[in-house]
């Protein structure tokens, strides 16, 4: 398994949008995204930081139910 890279929030959001996530709002330095999966709605918060910490990105991927390899292909 690869190591989680250090990326900017714009790169992360761009990849998540390719996976079907939609930006619903931004408040301050936090961006909210959501995705409808079946009969449930998943929500994420991505901090608008450059770069986003690798541990934070790891938690975002867990919440998004995305594996690192698939995420890296979306970049």
Feature names for model-found ranges:
Residues 23-59:
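A short, structured beta-strand/loop element
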């Amino acid at each position: 398994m690869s190591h989680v890279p250090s990326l900017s929030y714009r790169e992360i959001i761009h990849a998540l949008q390719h996976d079907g996530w939609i930006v619903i709002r931004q408040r301050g330095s936090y961006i909210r995204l959501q995705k409808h999966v079946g009969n449930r709605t998943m929500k994420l918060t991505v901090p608008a930081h450059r770069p986003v910490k690798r541990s934070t990105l790891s938690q975002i991927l867990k919440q998004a139910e995305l594996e690192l390899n698939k995420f890296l292909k979306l970049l």
